Amino acid sequence: MANITVFYNEDFGGKQVDLKPDEYKRDKLEALGIENNTISSVKVPPGVKAILYKNDDFTGDQIEVVANAEELGPLNNNVSSIKVMSVPVQPRARFFYKEQFDGKEVDLPPGQYTQAELERYGIDNNTISSVKPEGLKVVLFKNDNFSAGDTLSVTSNAPSLGAMNNNTSSIRITP
């Protein structure tokens, strides 16, 4: 069974604690050594997902995390409860910062990712240069929120993205 790992600092730094699938209110997190409002990044392997909540008792603002999240945006250092759930293992598309599958890489499962969500998972705006879809269909959008504009569909390894190289602001991944 896979666990998530929560970190006190962005980019997976600082104190870290593994959490197995379960529900964690503030008192349970504190019993595990996780102080309130200290989580800044989360590693989420295939087979689990996490829902992070601003308030105790699974209330308030929330974000669902389905892959490694280098930063948590508005919930950075602002998480008081967490649900960790087992989910079916899915293939993940792999995105690279450089052509020829080089440089920083980030894996994402099927889903829709706006620019804000891509940044949560470590993909800065306009930085993708090559893609391995791993059996999935990846659609790259030049504009955020999947809005009109240039797109590129990728169903096989793409060592270069042509006009979409370093020009992607949102992504849709489907089986």
Curated annotation (Swiss-Prot):
InterPro entries hit by this protein: Beta/gamma_crystallin (IPR001064), G_crystallin-like (IPR011024)
Location(s) in or outside the cell: Spore, Perispore
Keywords, in A-Z order: Repeat, Sporulation
Keyword Repeat: yes
Residues covered by region (Connecting peptide): 87-90
GO biological process: sporulation resulting in formation of a cellular spore
Residues covered by the Beta/gamma crystallin 'Greek key' domain: 2-46, 48-86, 91-135, 136-175
KW Repeat (keyword) present: yes
Domain of life per record: Bacteria
Domain topic, free-text comment: Has a two-domain beta-structure, folded into four very similar Greek key motifs.
UniProt record similarity statement: Belongs to the beta/gamma-crystallin family.
Protein name: Development-specific protein S homolog
